[in-house]
Amino acid sequence: VYPEFKRLQATSCLHFDLSHFRLPLPIAVEMNIFLELIYLLFFLLYCYLESIFRLVVPVKRKSVKGKIILVTGAGHGIGKELALEFSRLGGILVLWDINKANNDATADEIREEGGTAYTYVCDVSKLDDIKRVSDQVYRDVGNVDILVNNAGILHGGELLKIKEEDIRRTFDINTMAHFWTLREFLPSMLERNEGHIITVASMAGKAGSAYLVDYSASKFAVFGMTEALSEELHHLHKDGIKTTTVCPMFVDTGLTKYPQGRFGKILSPKEVALEAIDGALKDHVVVMVPRSIQVSVVLGQLFPYRFRRRLKEFVGFGILPQYESSKSSDNKHT
């Protein structure tokens, strides 16, 4: 029986002595399953009612004042805007980027506004670099309260025209780096049963797109990783550690060239950062930007696959085929 149902039994004002009553085992098992199904139906109703209620009375945002917040890829784009906005909310920022000049520029802006920032040059594609810099963060700043895995890279083009080293680098930065940073900073969160992991993924990690095969695959991976991690934390009874996955559409960070789309607009990094922070501080599990895309994603699952493909063509979601694999570096992020 589910834990909530057990607690209901334990705290109920009605007590029956059934110690002398025994059902045959097959019937008892079926009764148990039936009761669990009843509980699930009531819990489903409760969840819907709560969602409707929250449309009228939104969840209050939690405070990050004095919290230590680490942002990877903080020198540019979404990472920079996330760092600036978190600082304005009172957070202590730990900035990682491979580009020292860009990282220092972000820190300077934070300090000019009266905030606190620590900067570290780190190539998140290299495990040894992550381990070295993580140790330094523990010594200089302390335990990280909020880990923002944002650094990303994109090499667009036809799959067979993308260089092998570019595919490997895409996964090293967009996917594997998330595992390595988690292995460094999650243990201290587990000890305290407190923390927040924010994963910057992409809508390309919810719906595959032509000429973004490697990129889409890397973002699908981190979406699944964060979802699985959330389930693992729940099973470990570490519900004080929250996870949020951010899935923006095309963002003007300099990564995506020749984007196409008949509807909507290219998002600015600041728009994405504001939506991401608002969702994370309300402990939302998934934040899609713009919010209107959530309806399309939910409804899209109800349609046949061929129709969904035709719908993508109608909307024009993706990048143009003339976008060839280009030289990119991970100081540009999604």
Residue spans of the language-model regions?
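Conserved glycine-rich Rossmann-like NAD(P)H-binding loop of the short-chain dehydrogenase/reductase
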Residues: 89-105
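Residue(s) in the substrate-gating loop at a strand-loop-helix junction
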Residues: 202
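SDR active-site lid
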Residues: 232-293
